[in-house]
Amino acid sequence: MMSKLGVLLTICLLLFPLSALPLDGDQPADQPAERMQDISPEQNPLFHPDKRGCCPFPACTTHIICRCC
């Protein structure tokens, strides 16, 4: 019985090797700096002082887009 399982495992590994599985190291790393380069300053409201609004008191301490707090 054990030899049959060994033969089956060997056949499976020969037909479908473990190197065929995609690993995390093969994936491109997430580059937030490169994503931010795709956003132009004209499209991002954080770069426009006139588009940033005034927030109510509790929110103005946590949001960076508030300019009057």
Curated annotation (Swiss-Prot):
Propeptide: 21-52
Modified positions (Cysteine amide) in chain numbering: C69
UniProt-recorded Gene Ontology molecular function terms: ion channel inhibitor activity; toxin activity
Principal localisation: secreted
Signal peptide from the UniProt entry: 1-20
One GO cellular component term: extracellular region
Keyword Protein biosynthesis assigned: no
Disulfide bond residue pairs: C54-C68, C55-C66, C60-C69
UniProt record similarity statement: Belongs to the conotoxin M superfamily.
Protein name: Conotoxin reg3f
Taxonomy of the source species: Eukaryota, Metazoa, Spiralia, Lophotrochozoa, Mollusca
